[in-house]
Amino acid sequence: MSVVSSVTVKVPGTTANLGPGFDCIGAALTIYNQFQFTRLETSELIIQATGAEAERVPTDESNLLYQAFVKLYQYIDQTPPGVKVEIELGVPLARGLGSSATAIVGGLVAANRLAGEPLSQAQVMELAIAIEGHPDNVVPALVGGCRLAATGAMGWEICDVPWHGDIVPVLAIPDFELSTSEARRVLPTEYSRADAIFNTAHLGLLLRGLQTGKGEWLRAALQDKLHQPYRQALIPGYDAVNTAAVAAGAYGMVISGAGPTLLALADVSHAAAVAAAMSTAWREAGIKAVVRSLALDTHGAT
């Protein structure tokens, strides 16, 4: 078997939760990080990063991308080679768009390819979930599409969620950060039965709305009582941006992942107006934001 000397992995950013699907549903988006690993003759580690906020990327063994790379080699009981790692950043850091998931998936996939692909995609997925701690970002980052994950008797069960072609994800990405740990600290440790039932019903409605593109279902579905009511206060201007998005024709707006990025779903005919309205609302609130209309990535890590 020939030894591969260099691999390049392109991994999509993701949006998780989609309102009522807290910690169990996520979708891959057409925004990417790219990672190139080149095998070295020595045990040296070289990490170089370019793109937005590249100066913040660790260039030593604490780098999450490299840690995932090493984790796979440990799993297959091999010593990781020295590598030069070149990172091209397209997914904003700490904005609720799965930047850490791109690193985990990128490191695992690159290691698997350099090692001759000893692990199946399902095994790589299990490792990714174990590292991240939850499936909603790493699963769509690896396999693409919109995915629902649940634990079964034999491990994780992953379900493809059909996404109607007329549904456009519109992202408003502010110039401030919100860490996942901070966003989790504000959540209660217990919920009422009524709130659990509310989210169960709305997640079911969301799945059907995404499949059919039916506006009435989507407008009702994008509600949540488990995480968003507690996190909204951490995002200045949330109410104004939400009001503007809905007034411009969005089905609704949710927090992308742990935030602070806000995600609106709209049909093709309203997407541009929704994007403009969200941008204006945040600007009037004194916050700079980049607003992008994206699409569902259906390939995952390539």
UniProtKB/Swiss-Prot annotation:
Keyword Cytoplasm: yes
UniProt KW Protease keyword: no
Reactions it catalyzes: L-homoserine + ATP = O-phospho-L-homoserine + ADP + H(+)
Gene3D superfamilies found in the cross-reference section: 3.30.230.10, GHMP kinase, C-terminal domain
Pathway: Amino-acid biosynthesis; L-threonine biosynthesis; L-threonine from L-aspartate: step 4/5
Signal sequence, renumbered to the chain: none
UniProt xrefs under Pfam families: GHMP_kinases_C (PF08544), GHMP_kinases_N (PF00288)
Positions with a binding annotation for ATP: 92-102
GO BP annotations listed: threonine biosynthetic process
Residue ranges crossing the lipid bilayer per the database entry: none
Cell compartments where the protein resides: Cytoplasm
Location (main, coarse): cytoplasm
A GO term for molecular function: homoserine kinase activity
SUPFAM superfamilies named in the record: GHMP Kinase, C-terminal domain, Ribosomal protein S5 domain 2-like
InterPro entries reported for this sequence: GHMP_kinase_C_dom, GHMP_kinase_C_sf, GHMP_kinase_N_dom, GHMP_knse_ATP-bd_CS, Homoserine_kinase, Ribosomal_Su5_D2-typ_SF, Ribsml_uS5_D2-typ_fold_subgr
Alphabetized UniProt keyword annotations: Amino-acid biosynthesis, ATP-binding, Cytoplasm, Kinase, Nucleotide-binding, Threonine biosynthesis, Transferase
Principal EC category: transferase
Cellular component GO terms, alphabetical: cytoplasm
E.C. number(s) listed in UniProt: 2.7.1.39
HAMAP family listed in its UniProt record: Homoser_kinase
PANTHER family: HOMOSERINE KINASE (PTHR20861:SF1), HOMOSERINE/4-DIPHOSPHOCYTIDYL-2-C-METHYL-D-ERYTHRITOL KINASE (PTHR20861)
Function: Catalyzes the ATP-dependent phosphorylation of L-homoserine to L-homoserine phosphate.
Assigned protein family: Belongs to the GHMP kinase family. Homoserine kinase subfamily.
Protein name: Homoserine kinase
